């Protein structure tokens, strides 16, 4: 607590001056006087002139340093607050949409039935059973791949046939046009010959 000091003068005033205990107490005042005037060191050291020149030269040669990229919550894809996150459920990113299969596509249906519960169901089976099941799945996948390859090949053959037909039609059209041109040239030359023949009339 500070000590209250009354001011004395010719006319006593009712003013009171409150002085801190540090200055009132002699021991405290001496300790304060002996303490060095320390200022807090700044976290960043001031750059040296030589260092600054070096950095400037480096910037001229190689360009400025890239600033450290700061990411927002949206970039980091953090879950928003007050939102329940279901454990084990991962939202799929990227391509959205469903892959539809034909109703009578038994191969794909069998493969899906065999593989759909592998990740989530705790199947207790022996190694031999597991190997058999995986072999069946592999066989189904192989058949699917073969079918896709056959479909691609048939599509390619159809395209080839179509191109062949187009080229043959174009070839026949070119031949026909050439024949027509030759016929036209022949008829025009015949007309010119007939015109050149002199006709003699007797009176």
Curated annotation (Swiss-Prot):
Alphabetized UniProt keyword annotations? Coiled coil, mRNA transport, Nucleus, Ribosome biogenesis, Transport
**Stretches assigned to coiled coil:** 129-176
User: Where do the record's region annotations for Disordered lie?
Assistant: 1-82, 147-203
Gene Ontology CC terms: nucleolus; preribosome, large subunit precursor; protein folding chaperone complex
Could you state one GO biological process linked to this protein? ribosomal large subunit biogenesis
Q: Does the keyword rRNA processing apply?
A: no
Location relative to the cell: Nucleus, Nucleolus
Write out the biased-composition intervals (Polar residues).
Answer: 27-39
Entry keyword Transport = yes
Tell me the leader sequence span: none
An example molecular function term from Gene Ontology annotations: RNA folding chaperone
Q: Where is the composition biased (Basic and acidic residues)?
A: 68-77, 147-165
Basic residues compositional bias, start-end:
166-178, 194-203
PANTHER family xref list: 60S RIBOSOMAL SUBUNIT ASSEMBLY/EXPORT PROTEIN LOC1, 60S RIBOSOMAL SUBUNIT ASSEMBLY_EXPORT PROTEIN LOC1
Instruction: Please describe the quaternary structure of this protein.
Output: Component of the 66S pre-ribosomal particle.
What is known about what this protein does? Required for efficient assembly and nuclear export of the 60S ribosomal subunit.
Which family is annotated? Belongs to the LOC1 family.
Provide the protein name.
Answer: 60S ribosomal subunit assembly/export protein LOC1
Which organism is this protein's natural source?
Answer: Candida glabrata (strain ATCC 2001 / BCRC 20586 / JCM 3761 / NBRC 0622 / NRRL Y-65 / CBS 138) (Yeast)
């Amino acid at each position: 607590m500070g000590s209250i000091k009354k001011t004395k003068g010719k006319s006593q005033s009712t003013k009171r001056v409150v002085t801190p205990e540090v200055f009132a107490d002699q021991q405290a005042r001496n300790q304060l006087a002996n303490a060095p005037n320390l200022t807090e060191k700044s976290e960043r050291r001031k750059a040296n002139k030589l260092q600054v020149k070096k950095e400037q030269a480096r910037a001229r040669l190689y360009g400025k340093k890239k600033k450290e990229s700061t990411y927002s919550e949206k970039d980091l894809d953090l879950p928003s607050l007050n939102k329940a996150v279901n454990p084990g459920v991962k939202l799929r990113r990227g391509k959205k949409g469903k892959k539809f299969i034909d109703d009578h596509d038994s191969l794909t249906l069998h493969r899906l039935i065999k593989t759909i519960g592998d990740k989530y169901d705790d199947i207790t089976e022996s190694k031999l059973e597991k190997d058999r099941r995986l072999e069946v799945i592999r066989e189904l996948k192989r058949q699917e791949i073969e079918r896709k390859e056959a479909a691609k090949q048939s599509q390619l053959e159809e395209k080839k046939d179509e191109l062949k037909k187009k080229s043959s039609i174009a070839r026949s059209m070119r031949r026909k046009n050439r024949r027509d041109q030759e016929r036209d040239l022949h008829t025009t030359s015949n007309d010119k010959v007939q015109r050149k023949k002199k006709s003699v009339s007797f009176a």
